[in-house]
C-alpha cells in the first residue's frame, strides 16, 4: 500500500495521520503528528480466538520513549522500564472508549501499542494516542464499530479551549478528556476547580462537537486505504439452549436478586447456576451444547432479570429507591499513631484512609521524558482481594488501582493548599476493606476526612458518588450510589466528586449509544443531591480541618535568609548544617532563594535549630556586646567565637585593663567570655575587646 497522508487543523494544532510506510506487517499502523509530538500507533489482531476463551483479550500499551524528549533514561540500565503511572493512565484512557465498540462475542486477541517518538513539551501524547488508536483500529479490518474521536478541553475566563497546551492547562480551571463516536459520548475523564454542573456538561458537549472532524478524517483515511470490512460473523444464538435454560431457572434468578446482602445474593445466584449446570449436564452431551455457551447465556439472563425488574418496579436490588444513598457511617482518628485517619462506610463499601505528612524532600521525584520534577501530593489506592471476599494476588498495584487512585486524587486536588500555604509533602493511602460498588468515591470521602483529621487546611470537605444508568429503548432510570451488580449489569458508570460549591472531578464510562444530553444533565443533578447528602453525613463527624497537627506529625518552621548567606549555614563541606541537624535532631531543607524549612516532631528542637541558623546568618554589629567561647589561644591574643561560624580576635592589649604578659594566664580554650565588637573591617575581620566590657560595666 502506498503512503497515505491526511492533515487537518485541530484547535491551535496541525494534526497529520500517515499510514502505509511504517510497521506494514501490523494489521493497522498510523503515525500521528500533532505539531512536533509524533506517535506510532499499531494494532495487531489474532485471526482466531483461543480455545475456551471466554473474555475479550484487548491490551493497550502506551509508552513514552526517552529519546522523544532528547533524554537518556536515568535508571541503572539506561533504557525504558516498566510502565510509569502516567503511561498506565493513558493506556486506560485509550482502552475505555474503544472496548465497548467490539462485539460481545468477539474473543480474538487484540493488541494496541502507542509509542511516543517525539515529544513537544507543550503537547502531551494522550490525545494523539487516542486518535492514532482509533485510526489504526479502523484500518485493521476487524469488527470495530468506530472510529472514535478524542479531545481535551480547558476552561478559562468563561471560554472553552480545544486541546490546550501544557502551559494553558496550568492556568485552566478544567482539564477534561472526552471520547466518542459520531453519535455518542463514550468516555469522560476530568479534574476541575469546583465548576458548576452546567459548565462540566457544556465541556462534554463542546468536545463531542469538535471531535467530529477527527472521525471524518479517519473515515476518509480508511476509505482511501481501501480497508475491507471484517468478515467475522458472530456465532448463531442457540435458541433451544436459551429455552431450556429459562425452563430450568424459572423464577429463581428473580428471587435471588431480591436478596439485599451482597454475599448472600452472590451465593444464591451461584447455587442457581450450579443447579442449572447439573440439571442440563445430560442435555449438553446429547445436544452437543457447549458449557461456555451455557454460562454465557446464564449471564445474559442475569443481565435481563436485573434490568427488567429495575425498569418495571423502579426498586433497586437492595430495596432502595432510584435516588437513595446507602446508609453512611463516618469515624475519624481511628488509628492512634498516624497523622490523620478516617473510616468511611457506605452500605457494603468501606475504606480506611490515612494521611501522612512529610517534608519537601519526601516528595516523589518523577523522571519524565520532559525532565525531572517532584510530586508533593501522593494518593495511593489499594484494593485487596479480601474486600470482595475472595483470594487473589496481593501486593503490586494493578492498572485499575492506579486509575482509581488518580481519580480519587483528582477529587480532592481542587481543595488542597499550595506548597507555599502548607509546605508539607502529603501522602494519602486508601485501603479498601469492603467493596460493593463505588470504592473510588468512598476513597474521596475518606481522604477528605483523613486530611482534615491531620490538620491539612483544605478549602472545603469533598465527597464523591457513583451514578448508574439502565436504558432500554426510550425507557431509562438513573441510579444514585450504585452497587457492584448495578455497575456490572448497567449501561453507565458516572462518578462525580466535589464540594457543596462545585465539581472537582468527573469520570464517565458509557457502554451503549443513545445517551442524550438530558440523561447526562439528570445524572449530574441527581449526583449533586447525593453529594450534598453525603457531605452532610460527613460533617457530623468532622466539618473542618483540625486546628493542630498530630503530636506525631513533623512541625515545620520556615525562615528566610539572604541567598549569599546560604554558604555560611552549610559550612565547609556541610559541617555547619550537619552539626545543627545532629545536635537538634531536626531535618533542614535549604532552597536556592534562601528559604529554609526546619522539620521536627519536637517543637523545642526546631526552635533551637532556627535560633542557631539566625545566629549564623545575623550580621555582627560594632559596639554590641556578645557572649562567646574562646576558640584558640595565640601569643598575640585569643580568637573568640561569638556566633556560629563567626570568630573575632581579642588582642592581648584588649584582654584586661591590667598588663597581660601571657594570654594563657587570663584565658583558656573553652572559656565563656563577654566581648564587645570594636570593629568589622572591609575583609570581614572582627576586632573584639574584653577590657571594653569591663570598663562599661564599671562605669554604670
Swiss-Prot record:
* Short name of one Pfam family: RNase_PH_C
Superkingdom per UniProt = Bacteria
The cofactor named in the record is: Mg(2+)
Gene Ontology molecular function terms on file: 3'-5'-RNA exonuclease activity; magnesium ion binding; polyribonucleotide nucleotidyltransferase activity; RNA binding
Enzyme Commission identifier(s): 2.7.7.8
Q: Outline the extent of the KH domain.
A: 554-613
User: What's a single GO BP term from this record?
Assistant: RNA processing
Record's subcellular location:
Cytoplasm
Keywords (A to Z) from UniProt: Cytoplasm, Magnesium, Metal-binding, Nucleotidyltransferase, RNA-binding, Transferase
Sites binding Mg(2+) sit at 487, 493
Annotated catalysed reactions: RNA(n+1) + phosphate = RNA(n) + a ribonucleoside 5'-diphosphate
Instruction: Specify the enzyme's EC class, one word.
Output: transferase
Q: Which residues form a coiled coil?
A: none
Domain named S1 motif: residues: 623-691
Provide a GO CC annotation, any one.
Answer: cytosol
Database matches in PANTHER family = POLYRIBONUCLEOTIDE NUCLEOTIDYLTRANSFERASE, POLYRIBONUCLEOTIDE NUCLEOTIDYLTRANSFERASE 1, MITOCHONDRIAL
Tell me which family the UniProt entry assigns to this protein. Belongs to the polyribonucleotide nucleotidyltransferase family.
Per UniProt, subunit arrangement is:
Component of the RNA degradosome, which is a multiprotein complex involved in RNA processing and mRNA degradation.
- Biological function: Involved in mRNA degradation. Catalyzes the phosphorolysis of single-stranded polyribonucleotides processively in the 3'- to 5'-direction.
Name of the protein described by the UniProt record: Polyribonucleotide nucleotidyltransferase
List the source organism: Xylella fastidiosa (strain 9a5c)
Amino acid at each position: 500500500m502506498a503512503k497515505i497522508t491526511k492533515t487537518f487543523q485541530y484547535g491551535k494544532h496541525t494534526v497529520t495521520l500517515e499510514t502505509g510506510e511504517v510497521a506494514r506487517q501490523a494489521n493497522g499502523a498510523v503515525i500521528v503528528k500533532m505539531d512536533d509530538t509524533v506517535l506510532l500507533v499499531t494494532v495487531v489482531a489474532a485471526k482466531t480466538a483461543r480455545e475456551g476463551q471466554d473474555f475479550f483479550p484487548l491490551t493497550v500499551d502506551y509508552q513514552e520513549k526517552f529519546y522523544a524528549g532528547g533524554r537518556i533514561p536515568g535508571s541503572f540500565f539506561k533504557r525504558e522500564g516498566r510502565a510509569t503511572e502516567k503511561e498506565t493512565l493513558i493506556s486506560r484512557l485509550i482502552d475505555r472508549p474503544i472496548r465497548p465498540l467490539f462485539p460481545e462475542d468477539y474473543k480474538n486477541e487484540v493488541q494496541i501499542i502507542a509509542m511516543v517518538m517525539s515529544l513537544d513539551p507543550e503537547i502531551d501524547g494522550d490525545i494523539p494516542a487516542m486518535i492514532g488508536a482509533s485510526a489504526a483500529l479502523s484500518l485493521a479490518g476487524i469488527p470495530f464499530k468506530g472510529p472514535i474521536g478524542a479531545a481535551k478541553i480547558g476552561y478559562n475566563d468563561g471560554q472553552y479551549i480545544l486541546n490546550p497546551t501544557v502551559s494553558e492547562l496550568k492556568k485552566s480551571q478544567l482539564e477534561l478528556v472526552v471520547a466518542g463516536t459520531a453519535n455518542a459520548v463514550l468516555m469522560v475523564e476530568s479534574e476541575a476547580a469546583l465548576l458548576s454542573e452546567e459548565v462540566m456538561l457544556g465541556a462534554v458537549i463542546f468536545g463531542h462537537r469538535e471531535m467530529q472532524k477527527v472521525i471524518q478524517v479517519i473515515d476518509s483515511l480508511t476509505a482511501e486505504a481501501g480497508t475491507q470490512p471484517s468478515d467475522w460473523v458472530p456465532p448463531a444464538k442457540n435458541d433451544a439452549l436459551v429455552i431450556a435454560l429459562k425452563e430450568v431457572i424459572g423464577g429463581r434468578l428473580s428471587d435471588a436478586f431480591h436478596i439485599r446482602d451482597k454475599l448472600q445474593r452472590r451465593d444464591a445466584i451461584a447455587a442457581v447456576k450450579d443447579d442449572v449446570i447439573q440439571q442440563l449436564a445430560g442435555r449438553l452431551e446429547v445436544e452437543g451444547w457447549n458449557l461456555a455457551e451455557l454460562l454465557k447465556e446464564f449471564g445474559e439472563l442475569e443481565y435481563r432479570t436485573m434490568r427488567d425488574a429495575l425498569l418495571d418496579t423502579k426498586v433497586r436490588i437492595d430495596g432502595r429507591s432510584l435516588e437513595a444513598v446507602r446508609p453512611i457511617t463516618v469515624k475519624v482518628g481511628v488509628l492512634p499513631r498516624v497523622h490523620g485517619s478516617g473510616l468511611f462506610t457506605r452500605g457494603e463499601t468501606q475504606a480506611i484512609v490515612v494521611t501522612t505528612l512529610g517534608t519537601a524532600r519526601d516528595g516523589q521525584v518523577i523522571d519524565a521524558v520532559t525532565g525531572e520534577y517532584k510530586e508533593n501530593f501522593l494518593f495511593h489506592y489499594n484494593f485487596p482481594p479480601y474486600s470482595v471476599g475472595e483470594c487473589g494476588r496481593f501486593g503490586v498495584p494493578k492498572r485499575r488501582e492506579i486509575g482509581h487512585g488518580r481519580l480519587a486524587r483528582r477529587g480532592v486536588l481542587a481543595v488542597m493548599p499550595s506548597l507555599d500555604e502548607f509546605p508539607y509533602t502529603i501522602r494519602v493511602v486508601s485501603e479498601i476493606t469492603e467493596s460493593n460498588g463505588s470504592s473510588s468515591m468512598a476513597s474521596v470521602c475518606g481522604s477528605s476526612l483523613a486530611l482534615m483529621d491531620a490538620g491539612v487546611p483544605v478549602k472545603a470537605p469533598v465527597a464523591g458518588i457513583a451514578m448508574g444508568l439502565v436504558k432500554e429503548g426510550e425507557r431509562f432510570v438513573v441510579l444514585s450510589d450504585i452497587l457492584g451488580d448495578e455497575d456490572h449489569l448497567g449501561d453507565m458508570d458516572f462518578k462525580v466528586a466535589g464540594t457543596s460549591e462545585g465539581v472537582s472531578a468527573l469520570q464517565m464510562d458509557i457502554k451503549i449509544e443513545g445517551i442524550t444530553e438530558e440523561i447526562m444533565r439528570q445524572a449530574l443533578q441527581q449526583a449533586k443531591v447525593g453529594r450534598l447528602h453525603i457531605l452532610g453525613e460527613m460533617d457530623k463527624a468532622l466539618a473542618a480541618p483540625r486546628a493542630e497537627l498530630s503530636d506525631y506529625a513533623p512541625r515545620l518552621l520556615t525562615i528566610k535568609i539572604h541567598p549569599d548567606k546560604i554558604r555560611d549555614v552549610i559550612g565547609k563541606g556541610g559541617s555547619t548544617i550537619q552539626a545543627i541537624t545532629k545536635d537538634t535532631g531536626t531535618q533542614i531543607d535549604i532552597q536556592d532563594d534562601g528559604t529554609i524549612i526546619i522539620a521536627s516532631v519536637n517543637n523545642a528542637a526546631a526552635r533551637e535549630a532556627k535560633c542557631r541558623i539566625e545566629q549564623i546568618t545575623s550580621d555582627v554589629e560594632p559596639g554590641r556586646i556578645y557572649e562567646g567561647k574562646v576558640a584558640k589561644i595565640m601569643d598575640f591574643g585569643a580568637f573568640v567565637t561569638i556566633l556560629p561560624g563567626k570568630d573575632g580576635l581579642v588582642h592581648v592589649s584588649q584582654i584586661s585593663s591590667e598588663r597581660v604578659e601571657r594570654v594563657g594566664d587570663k584565658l583558656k580554650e573553652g572559656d565563656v567570655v563577654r566581648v564587645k565588637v570594636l570593629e568589622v573591617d572591609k575583609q570581614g575581620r572582627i576586632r573584639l575587646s574584653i577590657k571594653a566590657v569591663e570598663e562599661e560595666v564599671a562605669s554604670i
